[in-house]
Amino acid sequence: MAAALPHHRLGGSETQVSRIALGSWRTFERMPRADAERLLAYALERGIDFLDDARYDDETGSAPIPTGYSEVLFGELLRAVGAEPAALTISNKLWWEFWPGQDAIGELEASLERMELDRLGLLYSSTLPAELPVPVAVEQIAAVLATGRVGAWAVVNWSAGDLAAATAEAERVAIPPPCAAQLPYSLARTDWVEDPAMDDALAAAGASLIPSAALAGGALSGKYADGASGRLRDELRDPRRSAALQLGSALRRPAAALGTTPATLAIAFTLLHPRTAATLIGATTPAQIDAAIDAVSLAQRLTAGDVAELRSLADLR
């Protein structure tokens, strides 16, 4: 039986999600199939029921199709581990890449076909192309919701202004406003989420926050101080990464004092935002799943003093 993880509601929707969401990105394509199956099965066993997938172009050079194999593989893995989609919140994204040649319903149906699913629990809208105004995008999403193949909708990396405009337009066309916004949020980057304009926009929509990039690409794990490999191994000398990498090393001291790891502590910070419903993570090992889940209980016992120390280390005021 899956371990119990706390759940939060996404905004004003009826959707309840585990406090940790597992993203797939292109991760599974880079792993041996057996390892990917074990990882997904372990995440489900630990109680993660919020799974994020999307259509990505192939970067391996070996996928049988140039784009969307990430979705094909995700669906195959779900079936291989015996997952019941109806018991999960599975999310995907509208990229609007082929707009207006492909509308929102067309993009959704293509993704569902590749995953071999009938329905999504959550559909995100990525940032809009210049030729797609917010009112038209919301009308497109209204048409998607009318199909019954999506439970709720949300946005990814939208500006506060566009989110506010979408909320107003949703009221005009009589659909629910976005229930969540997936935005970069970490000890290394708080500006987007903590901008007062974004807080106002989230409040107006009644939307939850889903932090992404919680470890700043792995920099906040502290592992690179020991020469570990990872996504940033080719960027360790990039000055744009230096602050996050230094912060990852600095987190070792407070993490040790709390009996945890820098990665778990960094994820816990994102869970403390009052609007956070779930923090989105990436993982390639069961240990990384455990570290993220440990952050849920850690967030519940961090004191105001602990948080003040973290913000001081990150030079956040």
Named regions from a protein language model:
Residues 1-88:
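N-terminal binding-site loop/beta-alpha segment at the start of enzyme catalytic domains
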Residues 10, 22, 51, 74, ...:
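Conserved, mostly hydrophobic/aromatic
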Residues 11-14, 45, 75-86, 109-118, ...:
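Acidic (Asp/Glu)-rich catalytic clusters
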Residues 17-21, 49-50, 87-93, 119-123, ...:
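Structural preference for beta-strand elements that scaffold enzyme active sites
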Residues 23-34, 92-102, 131:
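Active-site mouth loops of central-metabolism enzymes
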Residues 31-43, 100-115, 163-168:
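Short, acidic/polar
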Residues 115-131:
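Active-site groove signature of glycoside hydrolases
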Residues 128-317:
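Beta/alpha (TIM)-barrel catalytic core signal, keyed to glycine-rich beta->alpha loops juxtaposed to Asp/Glu
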